[in-house]
Structures are given as C-alpha cells and as structure tokens.
Amino acid sequence: NHYRKKAYTRSLLLQKGVHTIGLLNWFMGGNPCRVFASGGLDYFGRKEDPEKRCRDCERARSCRYYVVPKSPAAKAADGCVWSRDIDLNDNSQLLIDYDNGSRAVYMECHFTPEYTREFTLFGDEGKLTAFYNNECDFLIRVTKPGGSVKELRPVPERGGHGGSDINLVRAFFQAIEDGK
C-alpha cells in the first residue's frame, strides 16, 4: 500500500491534504507566503511484522481498521496499520500566513474516529463552520455577531470527489479562455 511509506508517498499532506489545503487557500482568498509545519508518526506503525495482513489476522474482528479484502486491489492494500515498515506521519499541523494578511491553522489527523473534513473560519462578520464526510454529506453553518445562525446543506454534484473533478477541469479551461 503506497500510503504507508515515504518511498512511495512523500507525505500524506501531499497525497491527501493537498485537496483540503487547496480548498482552504480558496477560502482565504490569498496565497500562502509563510508556513510552519510539524507532525509525527504517533499512533500507527512500530508494532507488527511488515508481512502481517488483514486477511489472515487473528484480531480482525476487534480491529477498527480491518479492511475486508474482497478485490485483488484490496488484497494488495490490506497491510496492517501497526506494521513496523510504516514511516509516514499520521498527523500534521500547519500554521499558514497569507499574502493578504490572513492566517490559517490546518490540522490533519489520520486516526480520528470518523473520516471527515471540518473547517471553521472566523472573520469580522461572523463565523462559518463547514463539515463534509466521505459520503458527500455537507453542512455549512454561518453564525453572525449577535447569535443568528443559518444552516445550509448543499447537494453534491455527481462525479468524482463530489463533482469537484469536473469543476476543476471547467475552471482550468475558463482560465485559458480568460488568458490567465
């Protein structure tokens, strides 16, 4: 599985987080000009033989990370999350300064109880909280000064990554047409 080793995936920030960081940059309306980063391998790895697989693990019924290896691709990716050969960070934090004066904190943790993306944006006109999970459920909550709250539940578009793949292609072609 290429999400286990730096030799195949330099970091999960580059492999997975880049999509969320791109969205964060869009929210912030600027370009990062300074970044401080930290992270580590603090939960997974370091315990089991690198050859151990979910398909023949004696703890399969009790392991929350058990993968049912039904397809050939799944069988290739059913390596134990506790394997000693894992060397990628399982958590990372970024402090980002933007060229427009805004700042952001980005945290990525791969051992949370759920698989979600959550954003909280603060500004002088209120707070926006956004939640997205892997099933394409979206919730956006806007809280204004004084306490009024508005909730939005956008309907995801069809297609890869909740419709964003085709929207990226459209934006790319529009940028070409606009000479950007």
Question: How should these model regions be labeled?
Answer:
Residues 31-37, 103-106, 127-131:
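Acidic/polar loop patches that form or flank catalytic/metal-binding clefts of enzymes
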Residues 25-26, 83-84, 94, 110, ...:
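Short, flexible, glycine/charge-rich loop motifs used to bind or transfer phosphoryl groups or to couple energy/partner
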Residues 12-15, 82-87, 109-110, 161:
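Short Gly/Pro-enriched turn/cap motifs at secondary-structure boundaries
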Residues 7-8, 19, 78-80, 105-106, ...:
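Generic preference for well-ordered secondary structure
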Residues 89-93, 99-102, 112-180:
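C-terminal helical cap and adjacent loop that interface with cofactors, partners, or active-site loops
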Residues 69-106:
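Alpha/beta-hydrolase fold catalytic core
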Residues 1-79, 94, 172:
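Predominantly a Rossmann-like dinucleotide-binding segment in NAD(P)-dependent oxidoreductases
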Residues 39, 98, 108-110:
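Short beta-strand segments enriched in hydrophobic/aromatic residues
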